[in-house]
Amino acid sequence: MFWQFYKRGKEQGFWQPHQTIVVAVSGGVDSMALLTLMEQVAEKEQLQLVVAHVNHQLREASAQEAQYLATYCQQRELTYYETRWEDPEKQRNLEAKARTFRYEFFKEVMEIEGAAVLMTAHHLDDQAETILMKLIRGTNFSHSAGIKERRPFATGELIRPLLIYPKEELYQFAQRQAFVYFEDETNQTNEYLRNRLRNQVLPLLKQENPQFLDQIASFSNEQRFAQEFIQEQIEPQLSEAVEPTKQGWRIPLKRLLKETPAYQHFFLTAFFQKTLVPLGVSLNQRQMTQILKVLNDERQPQGSVMLEQQWQLAKSYDWLCLEQKQAALREEVTHLLVPGAGIYLSETEWLGLIATDKPFPLPEEINQWTGQLLAIPLTTATPLTVRHRQSGDRITLKPGFTKKLSRVFIDQKVPNEARESAWVITDEQEEIIWVPKFANSYLSIPLETDKIHYRLLFKTKE
């Protein structure tokens, strides 16, 4: 087994001469086999091995096993690190919490030692268990390949050089090499799904097909090749199509709608992998199905799907936008417009009611902002009020003809977010005279004989 292990490791670049490599060792047959193999490799390649052990303190034998490893490393002049896991809530999310603790410890050891590689002893049976668990619990295509043989980690790489070997082969290697290893009796219990698969399901599958583990290895490789191919096709187009915004990202709808559902699925999967996954936001298959339904619904120009952590994917006419929504509701505010003065409606919006016969110095910071003007004839009933839109708002567009403000927004294809933030200016009778950026009321149009006393100036920072 050693020569096969050594040859493949050299070909795959699992190590380089004189490297420092951290080997995660639990004391079980798989990790002791890995340590034994790497000790032999180290002699040939002048490697510096560092052993990292986590004492989970879940069994009475844990302390004895840790002591054995400490003595083992001392006798062989191997650098040895050990830590103990203290968990006051032993029964809640035990596996996940222990795993997080282990890898944080391994990361610290790598940083201390300046190691380029962390090696763990995952084997082919582990791969089969992992793939079955993902299928049972539900997974998407990008995660269906199971455990990766290598990936970036901490100051270098995490490599699993035993991933092609069945556990039975490791037992045979242990018998030939006659090294000491420990059996974890908790692995024989069926409390956890992984144990039930290991003890009950895998033996039946191997009985049905003695080559089952080889089939798992082939399946995993084919899945990974397919994922890499799809990624190579999608990545250049992803970089070209996705535009960053202040709140997130957006994609031109036309770019996606001309593609097949299969392309849309993998494009969006890659998009989320690049944007949301690094933020700790995950999507399930139900959400992806809902997203594709909203995307391709020709009857609805707008639609949205809520995701974790207040993230929302929204279709809005020409764009598909991914943004994190604020949890707080919009504050209902009303401002009375004082002639000859201006007010900041927000950090990027300013409104002033300016007399035509008096100079009015604008705040210096808004001079470069985009502006809109509306003349206010003397016949306009004052005072004027500014507020956000309300349900049932109507605006007079022609004599005797009013239109719902909501319909004005729809006709102009105004996104929902812009509708909610739009400002409405009303006269003393609460008639809408202006919706800056969107609509002027017929009531605001001065007659030739009207005298203009004021102008409304609306400034926005784009």
Curated annotation (Swiss-Prot):
EC category name: ligase
Record's GO cellular component terms: cytoplasm
Residues at which ATP binds: S26, G27, G28, V29, D30, S31
Documented EC number(s): 6.3.4.19
Annotated SMART domains: TilS_C (SM00977)
One Pfam match: ATP_bind_3
Keywords: ATP-binding, Cytoplasm, Ligase, Nucleotide-binding, tRNA processing
NCBIfam families: lysidine_TilS_C, lysidine_TilS_N
Protein known as: tRNA(Ile)-lysidine synthase
Gene source species: Enterococcus faecalis (strain ATCC 700802 / V583)
Lineage of producing organism: Bacteria, Bacillati, Bacillota, Bacilli, Lactobacillales
